[in-house]
């Protein structure tokens, strides 16, 4: 019985430690990864942690790898986990890639990306 309690406590401690050291991950994006959409006016990215916009960036490339003009990265007024990126030029039909680098309020930095298609 004593060994079971000690083992359970060790497992619980490891689980909590793993969560404390976790980096932000993208929960959902709009447009969604792999989706086909009409030209979006903005990207909306929701993360698992609060984001520091001044230390974060998003790059969007379109057909042929051309950079897509975007406005400044902003946080949603009600949720610091949601990042908004205006797309300032009309997106032409084709494949798009989004690459992001986010810094969270706890100081961790993480990178990721996804693709979508404009019809």
Predicted regions and their residues:
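Extended, polar beta-sheet/loop recognition surfaces of beta-rich domains
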Residues: 43-45, 108-119
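N-terminal edge beta-strand
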Residues: 21-39
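Aromatic sugar-binding surface patches on proteins
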Residues: 78-84
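N-terminal signal peptide c-region/cleavage motif recognized by signal peptidases
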Residues: 17-19
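Short, exposed beta-strand-loop hairpins at the edges of beta-sheets
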Residues: 88, 92, 99-113
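Short, surface-exposed alpha-helix to beta-strand junction/turn motifs within ectodomains of secreted
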Residues: 44-45, 49-71
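Bacterial N-terminal signal peptides
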Residues: 8-15
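Bacterial N-terminal signal peptides that target proteins for export
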Residues: 1-7
């Amino acid at each position: 019985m004593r060994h079971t309690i000690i083992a359970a406590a060790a497992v619980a401690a490891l689980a909590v430690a793993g969560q404390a050291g976790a980096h932000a991950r993208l929960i959902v994006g709009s447009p969604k990864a792999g989706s086909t959409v009409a030209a979006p006016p903005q990207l909306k990215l929701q993360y698992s942690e609060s984001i520091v916009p001044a230390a974060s960036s998003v790059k969007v490339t379109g057909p042929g790898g051309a950079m897509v003009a975007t406005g400044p990265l902003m946080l949603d007024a009600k949720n610091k986990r949601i990042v908004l990126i205006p797309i300032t030029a009309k997106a032409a039909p084709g494949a798009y890639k989004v690459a992001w680098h986010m810094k969270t309020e706890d100081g961790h930095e993480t990178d990721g990306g996804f693709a979508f298609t404009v019809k």
